[in-house]
């Protein structure tokens, strides 16, 4: 009886320890994350192909932000920043281009103005590829390890 109890205990403990071991998928994910973190360290915006600098950045950024608003006609834009070289991630690949920030005050669903909110827009070759309200969850980061920079 004692031997069977010890044998059963060994089997149960082995099962618990096996369940605690990281899965192959988890190990692969950690490896990819480590490779990505290393690639982030090698970003060089001075030598990257960022495409053409947008000469109509205000117009295309305003249009892209208006597309996201409840009441696009009420939007008031102020304090645009000059487009600067930037990088974002799309499907685990770096995309180089330009970013700009702007304050937007627009009406919400109740018809009241929200107050000035800072938006970040990413552009490449005259097109806006991403817009973020920096007040939203994760809105102040481009990707993990790279915060939005509006200065």
Where are these regions (language model features)?
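Bacterial N-terminal signal peptides that target proteins for export
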Residues: 1-9
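Cystatin/cathelin-like cysteine-protease inhibitor module
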Residues: 21-151
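Classic N-terminal secretory signal peptides
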Residues: 11-14
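C-terminal motif of bacterial Sec signal peptides marking the signal peptidase cleavage site
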Residues: 16-19
